[in-house]
């Protein structure tokens, strides 16, 4: 048998093996877990229930379906860091989660979306809610994370590149060209 070139039989064998290999690899992708949903959060001051409630609370205040909980967990880790050094702050968070759970005498995490929203609405003016809301958008919050910037197409602060005057402010790609 000649090894020069590729005949019809060799082509069919090679392409069918490649197709079978692609099918196996493609089906394995459905089995592998989504890395955006695999996350771990370490807290030292806040207990697990309080921390998980705060993650879901941050998501409820600033919902983005395409963002995984890992981005919201970073906010809770920052809340925990502040709670380590400020006992009054830790008390506000723990009592706030307890008050949120007490609205319907059921853990807030177990409520349906409508009841969760109603419970949050009833607590909007409390220091607890305002603290969590402020931390969620503050200097260590959701929109300060470079990976979140990438998700929304934000290139980051312009001052690092000389500001908008020397860099140009019309270099965005999402506006239609006229």
Predicted regions and their residues:
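Alpha-helical structural elements of signaling/regulatory helical domains
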Residues: 49, 67, 85-88
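N-terminal secretory signal peptides and thylakoid transit peptides that target proteins
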Residues: 1-22
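Short acidic alpha-helical/loop segments enriched in Asp/Glu that coordinate divalent cations
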Residues: 67-75
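C-terminal segment of N-terminal export signals and the immediately downstream linker at the start
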Residues: 5, 23-64
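Mature-region segments of soluble proteins
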Residues: 56, 74-178
